[in-house]
Amino acid sequence: MRFVTTPKATVLTGLSTVTLREWTSRRALIPADKPPRSKGSPASFTWQTILLLRVAATLRNRFHLELQPHRTLFASLKAGLRRTSFIALWDKTLALQGGDRWSLVEAAETLPLIDDAILIVLQPHLEALSVEFALPLPRVPAGQLELFPARPVDSTTSPLVGPSARKGNPDTVLLARGRSA
């Protein structure tokens, strides 16, 4: 499992160092995966915790929610994300239904909601995390995996061996290649 430290976590979440420390240590809304060893050392975070911090930042910044009353929701989400693969979250929307109830729904699915919910599209958050954590991007299902992927052939380049060398002529002529710096 790959971890990022506090400086990288601030970049990925868009939170200041002070806010990140407040949420993960002091108020313990979303605890760090590896707390700091000593004063001044950075905490470490997995992709699940960074995703959860991004969701919390969205709730605070876009919906102006107070986060402290939702500690049980964050704990439930963290446990659920631990059991869910990164790939399984692509094209999903997070539905927060109040209390500690939440669900993942297909982005294209029309949602027959029985109760009120806040919907958060996960796609932009996952795209940001996939680069930093070197996590896989979703592939279009093709039915069968390609053994040798197709590569474009450039017909404008000249061959490295002249035509006489192809015919078995002992006087092979190598054409000049351009040098690259």
For the regions a language model picked out, list residue spans one by one:
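A short, Lys/Arg-enriched interface patch at domain edges and termini
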Residues: 48-81
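Low-complexity intrinsically disordered segments
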Residues: 76-181
